[in-house]
Every structure is written in C-alpha cells, then in structure tokens.
Amino acid sequence: MGKKKKLSGAAKRKKKKEKEEAIAEAKADLERLKLGPTKLWTGLVTHHRDIFVSHVLSKLNKTDRMFFSKANTESLDLLEYAGFNVSKLGWSICQCTSVSTLEWAWINIDWGEKCDDGTLQDYAHFCSQVVRTNKLELLKWVREVKKCEWDKWTINFVTHVGNLEMLKYCFANGCPYDEQESCRNAARNGYLDCLRFLFNKIKPSRETEKDAAETAAQDGQLDILKYFVEERKISDAIKTECMLRSVFKGHLDCLKYMVEEAKAPLNDSQNISLARYYEHTECLHYLREKGCPEPTDEEYTDLANLYSANEEQHNSESEDN
C-alpha cells in the first residue's frame, strides 16, 4: 500500500501544537472533574441508573460509548452494568458527530498504519470516512481546515450515503471520481437526485448507463428504473436485461413496470426459468399471465445447472475474501 510519509518540519510543528492543545483541553476537563459530579450526573446517572441505561446508553454508538467511558471511573462501571464489554471499547471516524470529536480522531489515529481490512490510514482514507458521517460541515472542516487530501473513495462514499449537497461540494472542488462506481452506487441505493446530478455533470458512457440501469433493476429501485426508461430512453436490449434482473431478485413491481409501461419485449423464456429456479412465485404467475414463453425441459435443466454453478463460484469467491 506504500510507505509511511515522513512529516516535514512544518507538519511536525503543527502536530506538536495540536497535541499540546489537546493536553491543555484534557487538563481543563480534569479540573472540571475535581469539582465533583454535576446534579445531572447524580440525579439521572447515579439515582436512576436503569432509566439512563435503557433510554440513553442504548442510543449511543460505539464511539459515543468510548467517549462516555472516559468521563470518570463510574462511567466504566455503568457500561459494564449495561452489558457492554469495556475491554473492547473503540471508535470510528464515521461515528464522530462534531468537529471536536473529529479533532480527537485526527490526533489519535495511527497514521500510516493499516486497518483490519488492509486499508492504509492516510489522509485520503480519513476524508472518505468523514463522508460516512453524512455531515457536509465535517467534510468542509477536514478539507478546508485540515487541508486533507481526497481520492475517488470520497465520492464513492458520498453516493453510498446519498448526500446531494456533499456531492455538489466534491465536484465544485475538484474531487477525483470513478464514473461507473459512483453512478452504480447512486442507482443501487435509490438516490435519484444524486444520480441525475452525476449524469448531468459527467456525461457518463453508454456502458456506465447500462450498468447503472441493470443495477437499479436488480436492487428493486423502481424510481431509478423509471428515470432510465423515461428520461434516458434506454434501448430495448437494456430493458430486456433489466427485466431479467428484476425477475432474478423477485422484484414484481419492477417487472410489471418493465412489461406494462416500458414495453420491454417479453419473448425470452429465461424469465420463466429464473422465476422457477429462485422460487419467485408471484413473478412466475405474472409472467405466465402475460404470455411469456416457457422453456423446454432441456432448456430449463441447462439454465438451472448454469445458475447452480454460478452460485457455487460466488460462494467460493466470498469464502476466499
């Protein structure tokens, strides 16, 4: 993945200053703790422990619980009482909800080390994880205050969370992007506003359009499918493939739309084969009502063997990964 970059003199001074500020803030927090527990802590946490556990702790994410554990010695006891394994407390960049918690993550991340999945913890990775907070103000902070680099994964994650304003910000500021992956993500997750923005902005290739349309059909995103049929005017060949993808996953609403509104040619017996093999009964009944041709016994057996082989290969690849 690459060697850890050596920090310049200016960068070292900046890191030193950040740590000094963090230490100063920690000392201030310690002084406040010397004043003793607040009325809120005593009243709610100490005297109404079960209410606090069921209505407060249960709402905290992993990172929130980690910060809570550092409040005082009682907080760890309370987490144990609530059933959390305090030896496995941790944090994630994507769960930071404010500039202050993100600043803490910036200071405490193991720069240059690898995550459990092998991803290098560099500036671009940090930026992409900030996107997962779904907060534009945090992305702006990490870019404009921390001058953090970004790469195609920033926009890939933007199209996972579906934040249009964040997407506009990325393009306005020259963020790299992967045309096919970003369009596929927006289609898969049903983010029509993001998908329309991408198609208007980057003018993707026909291959990308085909891939995104088929992804929408397979994932049951009817509004996205309508966009490709009614606004993008996809070809009959793509409509036919979208119909097959809808049947493959049992999306009856998408299948009906492709047949009744998109007027996709209903002349491929593979539709019946797919519905039979994957036991999508409603799709099967509908296809037969609409006069879809039936496969011969030999055709069905051949396709069933092909589907089975594909499943085995997919499962084998999943185990390897």
Residue spans for each PLM region:
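Ankyrin repeat (ANK) tandem alpha-helical domains that serve as protein-protein interaction scaffolds
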Residues: G2-N321
